[in-house]
Amino acid sequence: MRIAELTALLHLASPALPIGAFSYSQGLEAAIEAQLITDADSAREWIASGLTDVLARGELPFLAHQMERWRTHDAESLRVANSEFLASRESAELRRETEQMGWSLRQLCVSLEWGDADRRATLASMTPLAQPTAFAFAAYAHDAAVDATLAAYAFSWVENQAAAALKAVPLGQLAGQRIIVALREPIDAAVTRALATSPDNINTFAPQLGILSARHESQYSRLFRS
């Protein structure tokens, strides 16, 4: 891997990227409220399940195929796939989350003039924009490999989930680091599975997550926006 590619992916996966990822828990806070998560072990199991049963089957293969569509600049397919991803969000919170993060990442891409002008124009015209579509553009604009991009995206997701668990369970810093370390190998497996998934086999079916996310919208006390 080239150093420029590595640093670009580190940038995109960084918690310092100003797209608001820190403000979302993607159902984890609702799982804590429902007492599905009570300690470090149950937090690790929940996050691992999200990685292998949700991300690996849905978001990661979607990201991979969107990168290919950016490469060929198939604008119509990009828009259709983006709309399908938005429609797959099972609650208002999850829909707003991906739209807000997609909008913020697009602002960054356009302001920093990443990629070529024609593709940036296509990106700017897509409203609302799903966050993985914007992430795929940013990774393509930096000539990042698909497998490395998926690994960076998955690691960023795991890290954000662990950070949410630290605040909401709550857990100690060492417990959070143990969760991240435990999920490094599963990230590898998730990427491998995602790369082997065709567009027709992308699956976003996660009823428990959808129900918990919907409940979170009216949860009395909460730290996160999802």
UniProtKB/Swiss-Prot annotation:
Protein name: Urease accessory protein UreF
PANTHER family, sorted: UREASE ACCESSORY PROTEIN F
UniProt cross-references to Pfam families, sorted A to Z: UreF (PF01730)
Subunit-level organization: UreD, UreF and UreG form a complex that acts as a GTP-hydrolysis-dependent molecular chaperone, activating the urease apoprotein by helping to assemble the nickel containing metallocenter of UreC. The UreE protein probably delivers the nickel.
Encoding gene, per UniProt annotation: ureF
Protein family per UniProt: Belongs to the UreF family.
Record function comment: Required for maturation of urease via the functional incorporation of the urease nickel metallocenter.
Lineage: Bacteria, Pseudomonadati, Pseudomonadota, Betaproteobacteria, Burkholderiales
Keyword field: Chaperone, Cytoplasm, Nickel insertion
Cellular compartments annotated: Cytoplasm
One function term, GO molecular function aspect: nickel cation binding
HAMAP family to which the protein is assigned, alphabetical: UreF (MF_01385)
Keyword Chaperone attached: yes
Protein's UniProt keywords contain Cytoplasm: yes
GO terms under cellular component: cytoplasm
Domain of life: Bacteria
